[in-house]
Amino acid sequence: MARVKRGVTAHAKHKKVYKVTKGFSGRRKNTIRAAKAAADKAGQYAFRDRKRKKRTFRALWIQRLNAAVRPFGMTYSRFIDGLSKSGITVDRKVLSDLAINEPAAFQAIAEKAKAALAA
């Protein structure tokens, strides 16, 4: 059986790892053992934070809405209650965007929600 020299495949595998760790500092970018560990950990962080990103953005939208409805004399929870009572089914992402970019439209929605609470 012929001897198999693995230099080419090993080099290709190492290149793949180094491509992931490009921009890392210290040994983590250019020593294969440390680079593999760093690349694995980076993948774990990426997986975890793709899930966390959804929570973080929802929290941001809620904070923005809470700040936007305070001038209308409501809290966030009362605003959401008013929206559901008035039958407005707009999600928090769109409401947050409206509050920032279309204040007049958001004001109309907030007043409808407030009217639904009073009724």
UniProtKB/Swiss-Prot annotation:
The keyword Nucleus is annotated on this UniProt entry: no
Protein function: Binds directly to 23S ribosomal RNA and is necessary for the in vitro assembly process of the 50S ribosomal subunit. It is not involved in the protein synthesizing functions of that subunit.
Q: What is the taxonomic lineage of the source species?
A: Bacteria, Pseudomonadati, Pseudomonadota, Alphaproteobacteria, Hyphomicrobiales
CC annotations in GO? ribonucleoprotein complex; ribosome
Q: Which GO terms describe its biological process?
A: ribosomal large subunit assembly; translation
What are the transmembrane regions?
Answer: none
Alphabetically list the UniProt keywords. Answer: Ribonucleoprotein, Ribosomal protein, RNA-binding, rRNA-binding
Query: Which Pfam families does its entry note?
Result: Ribosomal_L20 (PF00453)
| One function term, GO molecular function aspect | rRNA binding
Give the source species.
Answer: Nitrobacter winogradskyi (strain ATCC 25391 / DSM 10237 / CIP 104748 / NCIMB 11846 / Nb-255)
Q: Which gene encodes it?
A: rplT
| Matches recorded under HAMAP family | Ribosomal_bL20
Q: Which family does it belong to?
A: Belongs to the bacterial ribosomal protein bL20 family.
User: How is this protein named in the record?
Assistant: Large ribosomal subunit protein bL20
